[in-house]
UniProtKB/Swiss-Prot annotation:
SUPFAM superfamilies registered for this protein in UniProt: Protein kinase-like (PK-like) (SSF56112)
Catalytic activity: L-seryl-[protein] + ATP = O-phospho-L-seryl-[protein] + ADP + H(+); L-threonyl-[protein] + ATP = O-phospho-L-threonyl-[protein] + ADP + H(+)
Gene3D superfamilies tied to this protein: Transferase(Phosphotransferase) domain 1 (1.10.510.10)
SMART domains: S_TKc (SM00220)
One Pfam family linked to the record: Pkinase
Name of the molecule in the record: Putative serine/threonine-protein kinase R517/R518
Binding locations of ATP: L15, G16, K17, G18, G19, F20, S21, E22, V23, K38
Organism name: Acanthamoeba polyphaga mimivirus
Keywords of this entry: ATP-binding, Kinase, Nucleotide-binding, Serine/threonine-protein kinase, Transferase
């Protein structure tokens, strides 16, 4: 038992583990609600590893910015000499991996299985639509990073014999933003680091090709396949078999299931090995299976309506403009929030704003200090908010962040230049001399530059 910041009681119950962190069950003593507390070890080499600390800081700032019913909520962060503690929403109903096992063992009809799959993927689609519009790519989408919950009161109850059928109205929550990266609205924005979980990584990452945000669409397709067929589309038990299968094995769809043509169409187009033939995000979000098939077969229930109408407890704009502890936010994200989200929140105390700055669409001036004008509704004159870039040359405005409390935290890339085979060898060197013995279901690659 550990008391953190005189508010959170952290138990010894471990909810999950990572390379340098553990997630414990805790309680917010102010509200008596259960929370999840991620305890991150920053001792030893981590304490002086600027890239590690920048990555951790970026993960926290990303969680502070993202606010959506289908994303695990961020509550608080505390820092001590040896540990950082991130307090998050507690999800007590397992992960999407439990749904896959449930579908496999229940033996339900094809139609009910498709409805169940649709119920969860529709929520994942909403979460991904949100983070893409916010200018992020997740890069580690997998069932273990997709949590399930209900209301706070139900979350504080025992969840024995959980029914993962859609009738139980579980809410999906996308989690773990440790590998998340800012990306451009342009889907051709090229990534130059290898990361993710091999079983869910797109083929282009295995063969030293640059990739873009469509790699997450492949991960979406793998999850859809697993929900429907209870297995991975590539028959592999180790890394070498997986890579060979991605190169040479045709993805087959079992024919003994009577799923709709729209379901198969979406599945096959998300699992196109060539990213040029894969769906783009707009095509995924507006696919017939989500828009029209659901109207015929999946009428909305009460949880769907309440989930869609949920409004964040506070305006991110009010937090950014008024609080000295507000998170940094990139200029692009600030603009996207203003354009796409504020109209939904204006009855919740949010400000209505517009951004006025010169048309530096491709480049922002190289001067160290700049400011942008934010026009506030109900105000006769705009206010100026300082921005700063950390480059002596002209840079894309994605790299410019609003200044909060005088602090600048530039996002950095990190890792070693190495093809994926060498990375696998490096990561497994201390465990085994044979990378083929790698446990694919538990292994995660961090950022490695290509």
């Amino acid at each position: 038992m550990e008391i953190i910041n005189s508010r959170y009681k952290m138990t010894d119950t471990v909810l999950g583990k990572g390379g340098f962190s553990e997630v414990f069950l805790g309680t917010d003593m102010y509200t008596d609600n259960k929370v999840a507390i991620k305890k991150i070890n920053i001792t030893g080499k981590n304490s002086s590893d600027i890239k590690f600390l920048n990555k951790l800081d970026f993960e926290i700032r990303t969680m502070q910015i993202l606010n959506h019913p289908n994303i695990v909520a961020y509550y608080d962060v505390m820092k001590t000499e040896n540990y950082w503690y991130i307090v998050m929403e507690y999800c007590n109903f397992g992960t999407l991996n439990d749904v896959i096992k449930f579908n496999k063992n229940k033996g339900i009809s094809s139609l009910d299985l498709e409805k169940n799959t649709h119920y969860y993927l529709n929520q994942l689609r909403d979460a991904l639509n949100y983070i893409i519009n916010m200018g992020y790519i997740h890069r580690d989408i997998k069932p273990m990073n997709i949590l399930l919950t209900k209301s706070i009161s139900e979350n504080n109850e025992n969840n024995e014999n959980t029914n993962y059928d859609r009738s139980n109205s579980l809410i999906l929550k996308l989690a773990d933003f440790g590998l998340t990266k800012k990306c451009s609205e342009n889907e051709e924005d090229i990534m130059n680091t290898i990361c993710g979980s091999p079983l869910y990584m797109a083929p282009e990452l295995f063969f030293n090709q640059h990739y873009n945000s469509q790699s997450d669409i492949w991960s979406f397709g793998i999850i859809m396949y697993q929900l429907l067929f209870h297995d991975h589309p590539i028959n592999a038990t180790n890394y070498s078999q997986l890579k060979n299968g991605l190169k040479n094995q045709k993805i087959n769809f079992p024919k003994n299931n009577m799923f709709s043509n729209y379901c198969f169409d979406l599945l096959s187009k998300t699992l196109a090995k060539d990213p040029k033939n894969r769906l783009n995000w707009s095509e995924l979000f507006h696919h017939y299976w989500f828009i029209h098939w659901s109207e015929q077969h999946c009428p909305k229930n009460k949880s769907d309506d309440s989930n869609n109408k949920k409004i964040p407890d506070k305006s991110q704009f009010n937090e950014i403009l008024s609080s000295t502890k507000s998170p940094l936010i990139s200029l692009r994200q600030f603009g996207q929030l203003g354009q796409s989200n504020l109209s939904k929140f204006k009855n919740n105390g949010a400000i209505n704003c517009s951004i006025d700055f010169p048309k530096y669409t491709n480049n922002f001036p190289s001067a160290v200090n700049q400011s942008i004008k934010i026009g506030l509704s109900g105000s006769s004159s705009p206010i100026n908010i300082p921005v700063r870039n950390n480059s002596s040359k002209k840079i894309n405005y994605d790299d410019i962040e609003l200044i909060s409390n005088g602090n600048i935290f530039p996002e950095t890339l990190y890792g070693s230049i190495s093809p994926v085979d060498s990375i696998i060898n490096k990561e497994t060197r201390n465990k085994t001399n044979n990378p083929s013995s790698l446990n694919l279901s538990e292994f995660v690659l961090s950022d490695y530059e290509i």
